[in-house]
């Protein structure tokens, strides 16, 4: 997994490439936590994400919950068909804000 960070003022976009699995989900969680306090909104661009495991889904839900408690918008964008199917099958497409 590769995480590419891009700031536009106080809006952080994280472009995730590769796979989010049990091991890499911990890296993603650490990266989000390391950047917290530096952004007013978070966009996660998943256009180059190949796969996400249940551990990765947990990171997304935990991130949404934490950011919501601070009224910080969290949006997931550019979900491909493979990852979109995982979101639909798990019901996460109804929980997460996906554009």
Where do the protein language model's features map onto the residues?
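Short acidic-hydrophobic, aromatic-tinged amphipathic segments that line or gate anion-handling sites
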Residues: 97-99
């Amino acid at each position: 997994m590769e995480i590419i960070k891009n700031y536009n003022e106080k809006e952080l976009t994280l472009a995730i490439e590769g796979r989010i699995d049990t091991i890499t989900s911990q890296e993603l969680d650490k990266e989000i936590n390391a950047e917290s306090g530096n952004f007013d909104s978070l966009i996660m661009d998943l256009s180059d994400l190949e796969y996400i495991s249940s551990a990765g889904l947990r990171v997304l839900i935990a991130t949404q919950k934490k950011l919501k408690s601070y009224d910080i918008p969290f949006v997931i964008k550019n979900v491909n068909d493979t990852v979109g199917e995982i979101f639909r099958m798990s019901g996460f497409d109804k929980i997460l804000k996906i554009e």
